[in-house]
Amino acid sequence: MASDYDHRKIEAKWQREWAKKKVYKTIDSGDKPKFYVLDMFPYPSGEGLHVGHPKGYIATDIISRQKRMQGHNVLHPMGFDAFGLPAENYAIKMKTNPRIAVAENVARYKKQLEILGFDYDWSREVNTTDPKYYRWTQWIFLKLLEKGLAYESYEPINWCPSCKTGLANEDVEDGRCERCSTPVEKKPMRQWVLKITDYADRLLADLDMLDWPAHIKESQRNWIGRSEGAELAFPIKGRKDVLTVFTTRPDTLFGVTYLVVAPEHAFVTELLKKKENLANHAEVVKYVAHARMMTQIERTDAKKDKTGVALEGVMAINPANGEEVPVFVADYVLADYGTGAVMAVPAHDERDFAFAQNYKLPIRTVIEPLFIKLGGNDGVKEGQPFVDRNAVACIVKHWEEDKYLVSKWKTNDWQGFVMGGIEGNENEGDAATREVAEESGYLSAQYKRTLGTVHSKFHHDVKSVNRFAHFKVAYLELKDGKQGPVSEEEKRLQEISWVDGKKVKDFVNRPDVRQMWDFFAQGQMYAGEGILIDSGRFTGTESEVVKKKITESVGGKWVVRYKLKDWVFSRQRYWGEPFPILHDGDKIVPVAEKDLPVVLPPVKSYEPSGTGESPLATIDKWVNVKVGRGKDAKTLKRETNTMPQWAGSSWYYLRYMDPANGKALVDAKKEKYWNQVDFYVGGAEHATRHLIYARFWHKFLYDIGVVSTTEPFKKLQSVGLIMGEDGRKMSKRFGNVVNPDEIVATYGADTMRVYEMFMGPFDQAINWNTDSMIGSRR
């Protein structure tokens, strides 16, 4: 490259030329195939762009230009997500009105984006704070209300004491506010809520049709968290109360040895009203008060010891067998998860097992593991019957060292323990000592105990039969190393050796044998599927096939539940879309569509009140709306909560198709032409918020005929963060922010664009290094 190349002069010239000739202005029809490429639009923070922000924008610009050159009609717009907490918190910090702060920040962002030379059609710019835009956000809310998908709730919600507002579950990370990291509290408050759970199954099923990164789709599946299970009722002895539990494992019902309820459960609240209800009333009051002061993350910390207090004098009745079981209150159970009460089966649940050990509660095994080997020499052979066999598996300890006897078969790749059949009238102890002597020659094995039973279906290649073996897992110890002879047949079949205790689990290579070792190393807890024992008429059946039958037998209900909760859609802040709602006492009155938008009014004090009311509640002239005439005249009150920052971003991609339309959210012909976003680029951190919310709203708009597709974004590409040179996230707080304006001034926009695209894998985080710009500049 010539040393006199003046990037400032050349880049400025062509940017002026593109703007003057409106090179990137997009038409809404034509013979060319269409291509819609989109960035997740930014919220305009006061700090402006740093070099990490344009990474995705550069990628979409490259795709856009490529598609133009390939003959496509390309829509590549840009706008600003300017409502919500980020913009409002910045305005409060700077003691500037949010309107003024946002206008200044948007102007700065546009200037920064323009000098990078992107091919945006700025004539289609949208801004979520523009009344002409949020008129249609309000219109969508009215349609949701009309269809019964928006409702008021007074349930306890997530409350951030620092931001002084309610939060959706998606705005909480590990029990803390996503914006400020303050521990979140639970606070009962009137809220508007959207019934996103009505769309849960569709949100799950349609993920399969999307060309999205696998980890993003998996994040959404986990967040939606669909599970099928049973609601079972446990009557309380001597009372009219019934505790209803939700469980995905009704097959373990006969193994219940206690119940646990959340400290906030209505049953606990009712019991505490009278001292005589509980023998340990004072102890329970103290425990409940302490639990309610803890954050959710503290209560559910897997590393924390499980604590609880028995509700002394309260016994629940197991509907399966009529047994009386104690009831505990424990902080690890959450009132808003499931029913707020759980049946505890310590033999088949790790958390219940730990709690039962702490409080010396009974542990009753009702499921024995069942494993089926498929594939390989020892895989079950189709068409062959199974031959049942009672057998023993021997875990044998060395007489001096922490080593255990293992077997490696020579006819296939099986590795495990000494095993064999139980003959005639033998018990497992006799069979175990005999098998150890026959297969290893060791003569001093002493049977100590049986650890459990493991059932296994496999092909016994030596016997040439499909075997259904019922292994008693026996633990033995050798007194010494004395050995007798081992038959040549045994030597031909297997190799016997010793393995250090820490390496046994790595040595054994079949799931059923690993479970045998787990019985020894970890205790009798088993959380998998298997064969029922001690379960009345269901004994001997496979657990997976009997779940619904057991549920029906005790009058329970088979239900579908979701981890996903309905979307808390209110914020007790100023800077958001006003709700198009009036209140006539307890009656909700929607604002007429012809009166939209309900414009956000100026306010003297826009800082959050912390009282549960937004600053809008102080504007009497705006809040009080007179309707009717004469004797029919009355005053209604406006809704003073505002919508969350996610409202405007849940449909903005549609407005780019038709940004100036004053009669409809989007013209039907234009929507059908542009169809889905073909290529969408943005951060993976939006997987369980924006991307779920936008999919929900899009499906709703499809249902009411506004859009012609069931999904908004056909292909998604996630962007890896560009970190500071020190390896930390770029932040003014760390002093590691790199300003793109300075990079462009020194090296040029093209240099920066090339550098960011070749830093490393696009979807992975990588550290910035200004010195590396030199190669791209050349």
Regions found by a protein language model. Give the residues of each.
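Residue patterns forming the tRNA-binding/recognition surfaces of aminoacyl-tRNA synthetases
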Residues: 4, 13, 17-21, 93-243, ...
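Conserved active-site neighborhood of enzyme catalytic/cofactor-binding cores
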Residues: 44-75, 176-178, 279, 338, ...
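Catalytic alpha/beta core of large soluble enzyme barrels
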Residues: 60, 73, 265-369
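Unchanged
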Residues: 422-515, 519-535, 540
